């Protein structure tokens, strides 16, 4: 993949972080790590021939648009309720969670579930804990502008509770003053009141590119009943920021499947896992993570897996991962990585800025992968980024490696 393509792809906010400036700067740093102030040039422009249609490329999986939000709305993460409704987190212009009801319908009803402005300005990750309760993470930001940065020491975890009716309640679970950039949330299958949360390293200040020592990514453990939280994993090379793809990247989406924690690293392009004990710690404590697959040009965001939803058992551990302008499947068994939508298929420009994915939970849509995104289209240049949130339904019927 051409580096000129990577730079514009990153305009899709390659990380799960809601900071457009950081995203652009990250890939600019990857392309030109010695340049502090570089104006966009012709090579920065992604022309359609850079990712033009390849007659030899596979067709994308069938898909349809479930819902589009207005321009300026950034949809970041997704969880699926037991009744099949989708909950999606909004990062801009406000920290909200939306509900998409009966997403298998042609025109599903979309309504605001909760506005978290009491505690945060933007929401990033959302994950189900006990049935129909969800932990969401976010922070204050300096402005509503998508290019704004988060205010340090303001990250927190909140709970969204649908167990008492269709009008949910919310509460603050815990503040994380020492977190860098909370990202993805995944509950322990055997104790769903406890979640693990990925925390992406952040270089401070962003303008200082002198010290490029790999920065540590980390995993927090949060007890949602007590609010107690602690770091349970850090300083794994497989979680770290290495500056291979720029600044402010590293570990991103996480999922727990069986007795393993799975994650993807936007910086290394790798997918990894490590065995965990009943408390969420790696076992043994000096365990070496297993590399499942690497796509060096992939800028991973989040992913879905079979068998990670409440009440389900499955040996299928295929990872369906979002990466800037495409959706890919990763086989943990042999490391095979194949494109399913967007770049790498016969319609490379058709999947702009995907952010996260989850499978449906009803008989109607258990084969459907719901994918969220935040770009109107794949921009022709860095001057033409249009943020627009969306949800699409990908039909995975018959997919196999």
UniProtKB/Swiss-Prot annotation:
Induction: Expression is significantly up-regulated under xenovulene A producing condition. GO terms for biological process: terpenoid biosynthetic process. Glycans are attached at residues 71, 77, 240, 334. Xenovulene A is a natural product exhibiting little structural resemblance with classical benzodiazepines yet is able to displace high-affinity ligand binding to the benzodiazepine site of the gamma-aminobutyrate A (GABAA) receptor and could be potentially used as an anti-depressant with reduced addictive properties. Keywords: Glycoprotein, Isomerase, Signal. Residues 1-21 form the signal peptide. Its EC number is 5.5.-.-. Pathway: Secondary metabolite biosynthesis; terpenoid biosynthesis. One of its GO terms (molecular function) is isomerase activity. The keyword Nuclease does not apply. InterPro entries: 6-blade_b-propeller_TolB-like, Hetero-Diels-Alderase-like. Putative hetero-Diels-Alderase; part of the gene cluster that mediates the biosynthesis of xenovulene A, an unusual meroterpenoid that has potent inhibitory effects on the human gamma-aminobutyrate A (GABAA) benzodiazepine receptor. The first step of xenovulene A biosynthesis is the biosynthesis of 3-methylorcinaldehyde performed by the non-reducing polyketide synthase aspks1. The salicylate hydroxylase asL1 then catalyzes the oxidative dearomatization of 3-methylorcinaldehyde to yield a dearomatized hydroxycyclohexadione. Belongs to the eupF Diels-Alderase family. This is Putative hetero-Diels-Alderase asR5. It comes from Sarocladium schorii.
């Amino acid at each position: 993949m051409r580096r000129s393509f990577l730079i514009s792809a990153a305009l899709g906010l390659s990380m799960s972080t809601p900071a457009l400036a950081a995203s652009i700067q990250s890939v600019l740093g990857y392309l030109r790590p010695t340049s502090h102030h570089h104006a966009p040039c012709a090579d920065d422009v992604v022309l359609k021939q850079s990712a033009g249609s390849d007659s030899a490329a596979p067709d994308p999986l069938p898909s349809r648009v479930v819902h589009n939000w207005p321009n300026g709305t950034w949809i970041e993460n997704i969880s699926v309720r037991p009744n099949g409704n989708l909950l999606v987190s909004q990062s801009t212009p406000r920290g909200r969670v939306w509900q998409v009801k009966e997403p298998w319908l042609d025109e599903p009803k979309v309504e605001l579930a909760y506005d978290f402005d009491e505690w945060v300005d933007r929401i990033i990750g959302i994950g189900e804990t006990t049935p129909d309760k969800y932990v969401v993470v976010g922070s204050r930001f300096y402005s509503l502008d998508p290019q704004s940065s988060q205010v340090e020491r303001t990250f927190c975890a909140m709970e969204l509770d649908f167990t008492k009716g269709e009008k949910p309640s919310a509460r603050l679970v815990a503040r994380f003053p020492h977190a860098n950039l909370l990202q993805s949330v995944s509950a322990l299958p055997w104790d769903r009141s406890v979640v693990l949360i990925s925390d992406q390293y952040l270089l401070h200040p962003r303008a200082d590119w002198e010290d490029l020592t790999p920065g540590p990514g980390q995993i927090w453990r949060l007890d949602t009943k007590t609010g107690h939280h602690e770091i349970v994993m850090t300083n794994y090379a497989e979680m770290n920021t290495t500056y291979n793809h720029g600044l402010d990247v590293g570990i991103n989406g996480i999922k727990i499947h069986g007795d393993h924690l799975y994650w993807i690293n936007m910086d290394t392009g790798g997918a990894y896992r490590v065995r965990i004990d009943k408390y969420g710690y790696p076992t043994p404590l000096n365990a070496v993570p297993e590399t499942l697959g690497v796509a060096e040009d992939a800028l991973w965001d989040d992913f879905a897996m079979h068998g990670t939803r409440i009440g389900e058992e499955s040996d299928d551990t295929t990872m369906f991962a979002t990466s800037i302008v495409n959706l890919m499947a990763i086989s943990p068994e042999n490391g095979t990585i194949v494109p399913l939508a967007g770049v790498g298929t016969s319609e490379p420009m058709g999947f702009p800025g995907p952010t996260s994915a989850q499978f449906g939970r009803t008989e109607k849509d258990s084969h459907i992968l719901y994918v969220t995104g935040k770009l109107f289209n794949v921009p022709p240049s860095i001057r033409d980024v249009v943020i627009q949130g969306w949800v699409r339904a990908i039909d995975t019927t018959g997919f196999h490696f």
